[in-house]
Amino acid sequence: VVERLRANGKRVDIISKTHVASNRAGGITADHWVRRHVINGASSCDCLWVDEISQLDVGLWLQLSKLTYTGMQFLLSGDFNQFSPKGNSFRGSMIPENAFETSGLLHTLAGGNRLELVECRRSDAELFGFYSSLITGGSRFELASLMQFAPPRSC
């Protein structure tokens, strides 16, 4: 997607919360980008790809929300069933884990669009099935069959 946007003459910036994720995507950390382009300057990109969106804390989303009226396009990716931000609070009040996932800001930034990928293409299908079953709140596997993967315990 980024290659296509750039081929069409769009300037695309890529951010993520962690160094590892931002480096893997070819970008920089969200904290650095926000300090440089929102707090201490102005962004000149046409499209901002925010990866691992569930890891960004409310402080970063407050800063990014300032860009909603600039005409900037947002490409948002992540999995809300993974890590949530640590210590995510606003004025001393903890933010519920699903607050951003169900927010109007997410809907606005995404332009009302949502694409949910449900087919595994990068790992073992059986493991993916097991992980996916945990997300929905119950394992479809019997406990005895899972115990074969547990390391032996010494008493």
Segments (PLM) and residue ranges:
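Conserved ATP-binding/catalytic motifs of P-loop helicase motor domains
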Residues: 1-155
